[in-house]
């Protein structure tokens, strides 16, 4: 049986351009995606290019703390 922490964790990705434009972190005007990552393969912060419906373009979405 596997012991220790779970390898796959749930992370939240937030639009970096919406966050830079002065939008509050908890406001509904910031695009967020929920996904999973493998801690062993990607120990650092995850960044993916996703579509932001508030910016109307593809932007970098970075991992945020819960």
Swiss-Prot record:
InterPro entries per the UniProt record, alphabetical: Ribosomal_bL33, Ribosomal_bL33_CS, Ribosomal_bL33_sf, Ribosomal_zn-bd
Main localization of the protein? plastid
Q: Does the keyword Ion transport apply?
A: no
Gene3D superfamilies assigned to the protein according to its UniProt record, in alphabetical order: Ribosomal protein L33
| Record-stated family | Belongs to the bacterial ribosomal protein bL33 family.
The domain of life is: Eukaryota
Q: Which UniProt keywords apply?
A: Chloroplast, Plastid, Ribonucleoprotein, Ribosomal protein
Single biological process term from Gene Ontology: translation
Location comes to:
Plastid, Chloroplast
**Lineage of the source organism?**
Eukaryota, Viridiplantae, Streptophyta, Embryophyta, Tracheophyta
The GO terms this record gives for MF are: structural constituent of ribosome
- Annotated Gene Ontology cellular component terms: chloroplast; ribonucleoprotein complex; ribosome
Database matches in Pfam families: Ribosomal_L33 (PF00471)
Q: State the name under which the record lists this protein.
A: Large ribosomal subunit protein bL33c
